[in-house]
Amino acid sequence: MFYSEPMSDRAPTYSIVRPKGRARMSSLAPSRSPYPIGGFPGLSGSLVRDLTASGAVAPEIVGSVAIAAMSLLTQGLADISWPNGQASSIGANAIVVSPSGSGKTVVYNWFMGPIEKYLEHLSAADPEGWHCGLLQEDPTRPAIVQSLDDCPVAGLFTDEGGVTQKLLKDSATLVKLLDGTPLRSARVSTGRIALKEQRFCMLLMEQPDRFDETKPLLGGRKGGVGMVNRFFLVHSTGRCSASALHDVRLSEEVAQAYEERVLECLGVLLEHLERGNRRRPTLSLTAEAYQCFIEIDREARQKCTPASRWFPFSEYIVRHAERVLRLAGVLHVFEHGVGGEISLDTLERAESLANWYVESFAQIFFEPPKPTLAETDADSIAQGILGPCLMGGVYGCSVADLRTAAFNLGLTSTRFTRALAVLCGQGRVRMIRHLNKPWILFDLAYSPLNW
């Protein structure tokens, strides 16, 4: 048995969605908390702890691959109910951005090895069976749609360079597939295909350089394409030595338990598909978890107001509760099967993980505000005129003299006036009246009474 300590007994982690304790974030750029490994319960927690124990691979890489692998195993087994009674698919998608040598392939092999081994066993017994389409490698829309028509539960797991950019042109279709929304008519080479009750998840592993080229196209800030809002994103820059990678492994007990869980999940999925992919069991939240979920959604939406500094990421944050709910469904099914209700503890664990990914998303797509022309001109005056004057022992001058000097910097009278207002507003200079004319003090501690 694999046990997990309740969330209430663990140290709280800070979130921009539901801040706890006295944690503070930078007013300049979003910060990112340590990855909440404790958010994984039971067997999933043992898997993540084993693979991060050596410290060779970043915890966020291990956790993201774990979430994607568990989603592949569980998404076809159950749905989850929203508070209003509507059913939704479970599952999560991840984009892992890290350089070669970061260890993501080693982690991927540990999680996907038992799955691929089982699929090879099924393929040997039945070469034309549904299992041939469970793992997709072709990122083109026709191939994905055709595969889901053959096998309505699938995952696109790939480390092909630039694959994220290739998928963007088909984002409208992919969003429906990721959400589990019916696709009434999709054109493929053999005609048109209608999909219903399909379940699809993605794990995309990218190199930093290729991802940086794609990032502006993803629309992570307000007004984006929408597909990226369905993903957990992680950008890790660390590399580990080749010798350290040899220490990334599962203990014999955990590896055996994981293999058994893979066989169990895929066995149930096989039975479900052989019965014609009928409606899945629908999970619901306990009364306590229900109230917590309402609060999560309410507080996330409060972060999306125009006055909030998180407003640029509001399209991602507004889907925070949805990602929490779908991830909670994954954790519950992976740990407990399709029976019972999702507990408050499971929901809080899913929230702690999803909170971290909100911070990660904001950090990845953060853009410092661009200075206005007046602010740029103010900096030019400070560097080109005020600085040299102070170094030369000049602590002030008339407005007319400063305006004349500003012409040498290419500033017109109008631009100078606006820049001067910025300098005064920033407290870098002070305007006074001296000898019946406007005077500018460069050194605010210097008094004209001493002149």
For the regions a language model picked out, list residue spans one by one:
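Phosphate-handling catalytic cores of nucleic-acid transaction enzymes
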Residues: 2-451
